[in-house]
Regions:
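N-terminal secretory signal peptides that target proteins for export/translocation
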Residues: 1-8
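Right-handed parallel beta-helix/beta-spiral solenoid domain characteristic of secreted/periplasmic
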Residues: 39, 86-131
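Beta-strand repeat architectures
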Residues: 60-67, 114-116
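Right-handed parallel beta-helix
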Residues: 91, 97, 115-125, 137-149, ...
């Protein structure tokens, strides 16, 4: 009896094994969440690791929501749009190994739709290096953006809530022909990043922006390190270094609506004009600079050695 049960169990086991041998590859590959790209590949292309797509664009044409597109080392000369809920990941944690360079310099090199992510990649050239489209949530991690014809990263407007937040973490934005980062009204987190050597401002935030800036360096930009419009904005900053910029360390503009800019543990030094410039764009704007809040005690800022002084008088810019 026990022997018969044993053999029945083996038969069932063999049958199940045969079933899974047939069905599991269909489940794994049919519902695959990772698609591979390798420009040096030859032959058939189906997005598997054995037969990767040869271009990022081809891979993106075939992906579904929830897919990760993993890119092998190399320079890919393309302009791409990342579809909704797709991740673009360089295969090496050395972000200089995977380069996306604009084929058409009149278009953004990379455009990002809603719930998209990009990491371990260098983006070069294009009208903008990266354009984050309206009403989207996006995340960049360990990315370099450089040599674009306009803004390095251009962020279109959205509601200022977590659902539409843009997270920029451990990025380098450098040598772009306009601002390093330009943002319309948004909720933005910028941390652990270098914004350097851009031909206009390091970052330029429109009115109504909510932003957290932490542990960043803004240096060597031809404009101001940080440029903001205070009206209806809520901006918080801690442990940022803003130095050697061609204009002000921070340029604060206002048209008269209230807003806040909180600075803690900032180092604002050796900028060509003021450490902090206060520019009223209307008569009413001259009365709203109380929204600039400077940390004290353990949160005190170092604002020193700026060519025209630490904090400007109110400058009338109209």
């Amino acid at each position: 009896m026990s022997s018969r049960n044993f053999w029945l169990s083996k038969e069932v086991f063999i049958g199940l094994a045969f079933f899974f041998a047939i069905t599991v590859p269909v489940v794994v590959f049919g519902g695959a969440k990772v698609v591979f790209v390798d420009k040096s590949a030859n032959g058939a292309e189906d997005g598997t690791s054995a037969h990767p797509y040869q271009s990022i664009s081809e891979a993106l044409d075939h992906v579904k929501k929830g897919t990760e597109v993993r890119i092998k080392n190399g320079e890919y000369k393309e302009n791409i749009t990342i579809p909704k809920d797709v991740k673009l990941v360089g295969d090496s944690e050395n972000r200089d190994k995977v380069i996306i360079k604009a084929r058409n310099e009149d278009k953004p090199t990379v455009q990002m739709k809603d719930e998209t992510e990009m990491s371990y990649i260098t983006v070069k050239g294009g009208r903008h290096g990266v354009r984050i489209l309206p009403d989207t949530k996006a995340h960049l991690y360990n990315v370099v953006v450089k040599n674009s014809n306009r803004d390095g990263i251009h962020i279109d407007s959205a509601k200022t809530d977590k659902r539409h937040r843009v997270i920029l973490d451990t990025i380098e934005v450098t040598r772009n022909d306009r601002a390093g980062i330009f943002a319309e009204t948004r909720f933005i987190t910028l941390i652990n990043s270098y914004i350097t050597l851009n031909k206009s401002d390091g970052v330029d935030f429109a009115m109504g922006t909510e932003a957290w800036l932490g542990d960043n360096s803004f240096s060597g930009n031809k404009g101001s390190g940080i440029k903001v419009i205070l009206d209806n904005s809520s901006l918080s900053s801690k442990k940022n270094t803003i130095r050697n910029n061609g204009h002000d360390g921070i340029e604060v503009n206002t048209y008269g609506a209230s807003g806040t800019l909180t600075l803690k543990k900032a180092t604002i030094v050796k900028n060509n004009s003021y450490g902090i410039a206060r520019i009223a764009r209307t008569t009413k704007g001259a009365n709203t600079f109380g929204g600039i809040i400077l940390g004290d005690g353990v949160n005190v800022n170092k604002i020193d050695q700026n060519n025209q002084g630490s904090v400007s008088h109110i400058i009338y810019g109209f």
